[in-house]
């Protein structure tokens, strides 16, 4: 979120219920298919506050919050830029 001058950023990390995920397919109707870091494939919903403000594409790294009552669905809570995703890979947070 803030740049420390060394090319590194303090990135938003997953909170209690969130997991890293990679977008694998665009489904339409504000939904995407994601492969989560916990090994699950989920259908994720893009909430209204993100629509038309934050564009999500295939292969983007996002944070999702799985639903409590239906484990194969989730909500997208954050999208990382490409440089941020590269930093997460370098630091070992994602593969």
From Swiss-Prot:
The keyword Protein biosynthesis applies. InterPro entries: NA-bd_OB-fold (IPR012340), RNA-binding_domain_S1_IF1 (IPR006196), TIF_eIF-1A (IPR001253), TIF_eIF-1A_CS (IPR018104). GO terms for cellular component: cytoplasm. The keyword Zinc-finger does not apply. Seems to be required for maximal rate of protein biosynthesis. Enhances ribosome dissociation into subunits and stabilizes the binding of the initiator Met-tRNA(I) to 40 S ribosomal subunits. NCBIfam families: eIF-1A, PRK04012.1-1, PRK04012.1-2, PRK04012.1-3, PRK04012.1-5. This is Translation initiation factor 1A 1. It comes from Halobacterium salinarum (strain ATCC 700922 / JCM 11081 / NRC-1) (Halobacterium halobium). The gene is eIF1A1.
